């Protein structure tokens, strides 16, 4: 519009997208639970499973079951807990107007992100395993997490990656629900289902047949630890046809011991001695016993099954009953006795055995026993054995003579019965080397007083070279079974040995090493255990290779039938002898797994059945002459002999500090326990890979076709579920027979490395590979075989016979698919009733399908990216290809067309298929493309989609009409048809130019241009939230071929469009079909398409297998967590060593109480990664626990052991070894460094790795500077990386070469990955830099098997889009979170903070670390201020809390702010907004860079923050409680990208682009990636943000702009009470001239100053017409009404006086010049088509009309207003108008049809505020508060297809005043009359005389209205008689205006901003 009468015009343009909260994406997910074979196992175990489901997925009945609490304990069997999580609230997003100049506006296209609203349910399923063992096959879903659930109950749709399973015992406490970023836990639903067990035949035969019937465990090991009291049945596995009976032996576990209070000593009776002997017999003897109701057979668990399968003729089944008596061991109680010397143990009361008598029914067939079951049982309870433990400190020990061993009964774990000796257990050697005579006591200790006391069986009685006894350190408290393996041979001392060397010659017991609790103990014969009932053990391997690791935990347990193969004969107990004689018969001993006395069996190596393992003592050989040297580990026949060490053991001192490691054999500790030998052991093995090097090239072998000539070029990669990969050189490869088939045995060797086989430890590490199998032709169990076969014959028929892993096949960067040629055959994913999947596709499976058939196939966890058109199954299908029952889940990202299944389907059909996941194409291109949830482009008469669905989130950026996006298909043309299908999810399309919709983007056939050949839709539904698109189709035209289309009312379907130079967002009702309520959607989907996804078989790769310590000697059940923690401290040591040190941990230690996640070496406060370089300087160890607490211990290097650095851990007595072997890394670094340093950032090689073309700039990566820095420090980085990566157990050229090869082949990706992490993670927590933790310590959160090298390479390969700086939050989630064992970036940052700064809040840490200048201005209202201090809540104004909120759009700001290299950015945080700007926005010649600029910016930032605070304090005070709560939100404020320099004059005007070198742009605004559209406006709003353009945030005019733009962001939902804008009123109506603050304090407008504080001392005080200080004037809504009401007292009075002067003093023609009339006109709204919104039109008066104006009332009745400031013309709706303070609008013009015009609406709104207040007067008038009332009265309009109530002026008048006034004219007359009635009470006032020339200071005083009327008459006449120029300005040219201003100012000051009225006796 034109500028009238000097009015200062400020233009504002609409830029709001009104997007509210949206429904959550509803997804389907299917799970399975696979059961295993029966087991002879009576222990009860509960499996617990957690999973999530959205609240929207719950039925109303299910919601009623919600329990608002957390689950507590494991209760019944097979239950499910659905734990409910609610998504935190999200901001509504909207597009709002511009504010600024009147110049032509640029078109703005603002994208709005749709927020997902949902509630998650985390489900828990519990399975009790009683009498049966269940094998759980874990379905790998989502990003790879395993879920274990039953196929029923609720489906979980969101965040399935959180699904977790646990194995707990009944009564155990359930885990707490996880904390999930952005979600809040609210309760749970419990559900139960009994899981049946399947019996699985065991058809495998052992490789070596024993001479007697052996015992083989039928138990199929589940993925959880059995309870210690598990009863194991042992049976041989024989061929199916065999019917030979099997003998069954079962070992029952005795009770564990525990400590009790001390009691007095009691004498042992001979009866007790007998009981003790029997007790010891029980510790070894295998009692024959049958589990209750457990049937055992020869080959199957049920003989009848063999008959049914045709394997046997049906025999006669007979049974007989026998009585079996079983001894029950007694418990042992330990009591402390302060009168006994510390370490002394004596028996107070011997235990008595109990017994159990069972009647067993034995079934037989053909006289051969096939099974047994228990008929009845009776039990006699045992009596406990009480042992006293001394606690009195021992000072001196005198030598005692050796007389013999203590125990005359069988030891725990022994195979032979020792000779019975007198009670004296030990011989102490004097300084003369002669044995002293010891009194007849069980164990004697001589105190410093010469008194004898009972001495424990301690090996640590040390005698010095002077013959004087050494001090004995106190024993660590041991709460396990004291009665363990004891020394059998006397200790002898010679003079030749030095001090502190205890020489002892114990019987060398078998090596005590751990047994897997899940496996039975077998004898030393070749037995194949059946751990996997689904397939033979040799097939239980990964898809990449068939490897059977030679460990019992890996299903094979293969041991040579030759007892001397790999091991020597089992060590035998020796008779002790009392001389120094050399033992001629000394033999080596096998290191045999010690079976706890409570579990398992112990066998010899002979093939005979060991029914009675206790052999007579006379059968044993003696070995008394052998002496073990503790310090050297040497075994010598003479005391001075020196030989290589045999065994090593580290035995810490008993005072809690570790000693130097003593390389000893199995020594005996002070409490009589046998010390384990320290060895290396690879635990938790999950996969084994064989590699070889040929001519410098490395390849993996999944099979072998022969024995290699040279095994030196081979090595093994051992993968673990808990620890890093270990590379071991191959020592030998031999051919053997296994199960009748030839296989290759691979033996890998490393120093001290042993492997557990058949409950024994043998040297080295072995496993098996198949002979190269014939190529699979039809049924495939290998993905590589499938790909190879199809590529060779693309027309064949192929079946999946197992789920396949696409990781088997490596594709080059330029390869578009796995199968290159066009496939014309059949691919079927189902075989024998089982459905299989292909997992982990990185590219489309096929390039093209032509006439092919693909059915019953699932593609799981696809992660496909490509430049061109891509689909998961194929890029294109043509010529009648049929795709049926194909289901895909995962992520696809492309730069062109993308389809969940196919990019294009030409004359091809898809039926009963689905896609679930994300599709991303935000690439900006002008090329045509099509994106669809199932198919990008569906074309052709025979092309169809039927009975299918897509659950999809699509991110797109269409900017052309030939770019289409659809929930099911993008483009559907040439008669293609979609029917009986639906889509659900979200489509976020940034721009509005493409064709986008929830079902199909576009139906028109561009090829023919004919309507009849367009695509067709029948019976389809859209449950998709769409930004910039429609619900059903993206384009509507007449004659569309659509029928029965439906959409959800709950969906948010919005378009952002340009209207009248304004960007507006409007809900789309075009192509919505039949709109259904949310409650109808679920049933409609089921009606359209009841598609159920199949349950598919998981990958066959081994799952996680935790180390089991329960069968290790000295295991204590209450220390299970301790052992798990010590395992992390000693990652490569054997289980016996771990148990040993675990038993040293005190109960008050955190290692005892909490789960340890990781251990990090440090040098002071710096993290150490390069262990080799810092081996001896490391001095601290940080222990990080699962609650993210931490503690530090002093660390002291001790020695190297088997290429491991070994450290003492403080004074704990514990050891620590890093999770890395020591090897030569320098040679690797030296070889790869030159090639890495040659790389150039702008090179083609880098671009190829990023996947971009040469024309794409690398700017938005913001990595160029860092790339150079990274190359400078590359040598150190590589050393750290290699130190943190895979362990090289032997320093071998082949394994080193493999690493060299990997680095060279991936050098670009590695360097990009390093550069990325060094750029964005270079910040500190206190003194600790987190960069090294992120790069080199991915195990910090407990995921110990992550490879840092692979992680960096994969990050570098992840592509340009993933490495964009703006995607840093998603990049962490996609590429790093799973590798770190974390969930998301912000939880990771918080967890780091908890570890390193536990007493600092996230926000305080953030502020201390960022170089941005941050101002957080809290409210002056106390209750608000208190809330704003609540960290982590929606109320917090902490910057970190706000930008990490799930509702914040720019969470990617965190890392750029943390890594700012200099102070270049400021941040302002207040109640409702968060502002960001650059210092250089204010840089100029007046404020040059440096202190001047910094001080200016920071001072004004603080002042701006206070203004913004004051503005929302004002609104908080006047709003009701409900609306106040909505003020706590975060609206983005951005200063323009306009930066000055030291020469800039005034404001900077040039826009900086993303490639600007300005530090604020390069380090913050650019990386955040918000491409702000710049224009010539003052500012503009986008619903979720405000962007300052010509105005600047920190200036005063920026404050006024703030009130304008924040009105646009606040009016509908907050200021207007949530009722929304009244239909027809544009957004500018509510800002300028209504709710926005005035531009200047002197503005003569009816407005409210809500933001600026003025002062009486201001230079502008004389002209101020607005409130002085809003923070003081407005304390509540009543104050606001009081102010406006009293102001209108004056306004009405002056308007009345002016009106009287005009009607009484002016002529007709003078009236025509002084007045105008206002009318309404109605124009059809171009957006919604309605014609009920008034446009105000101001017109000149005719002479006839002027003649009618002869009274004041006539001015109201004839709709008159002043001509002084209201020019003739149309006042268009949604304009920038203000109501003039001194130019009367007498009219009360209302809209007879509906909504008022912009002038009348603003004026009446303020009059209602004066009369009724804000909430009861103004809000009802300008909002849709009465919409429902209008609807009930039949006053409706149609808005975008919806019937809406039409609020009319008449309805508002009636409702607001309760019918008091019949017309608005009557109301206004009453308002004037109310003031006229007070004229007699007018207060005297003195004002500046406006008639005096400036600078005259003359004043005038009036005492009554008559005096004022006289002055008004003069002024009116003067204006009427004076000339009216074209540049007329009332401020200068109008006497009336100047008089009114003077009077108004005087009363404003006199009433103290209208705190009182101008009338007496009126407030």
Curated annotation (Swiss-Prot):
Positions of short motif LPXTG sorting signal: 96-100
PTM sites of type Pentaglycyl murein peptidoglycan amidated threonine: 99
Propeptide: 37-99
Main location: secreted
Family, per entry: Belongs to the peptidase M26 family.
Required cofactor(s): Zn(2+)
GO CC terms of this entry: extracellular region; membrane
Active site: 1605
Membrane topology according to the record: Multi-pass membrane protein; Peptidoglycan-anchor
Parts of the chain on the Extracellular side: 155-1963
Protein name stated in the entry: Immunoglobulin A1 protease
Record EC number: 3.4.24.13
Job of this protein: Zinc metalloproteinase which cleaves human immunoglobulin A1 (IgA1) in the hinge region.
Chain spans, region Disordered: 253-305, 402-681
Signal sequence residues: 1-36
Cofactor detail note: Binds 1 zinc ion per subunit.
Subcellular location: Secreted, Cell wall; Membrane
Keywords of this entry: Cell wall, Hydrolase, Membrane, Metal-binding, Metalloprotease, Peptidoglycan-anchor, Protease, Repeat, Secreted, Signal, Transmembrane, Transmembrane helix, Zinc
Annotated catalysed reactions: Cleavage of Pro-|-Thr bond in the hinge region of the heavy chain of human IgA
Skewed-composition ranges (Basic and acidic residues): 276-296, 485-511, 574-591
Spans through the membrane: 106-125, 132-154
UniProt-annotated binding residues for Zn(2+): 1604, 1608, 1628
Class in the EC hierarchy, top level: hydrolase
Composition bias type Polar residues, residue spans: 516-529, 538-572, 618-639, 648-674
Superkingdom assignment: Bacteria
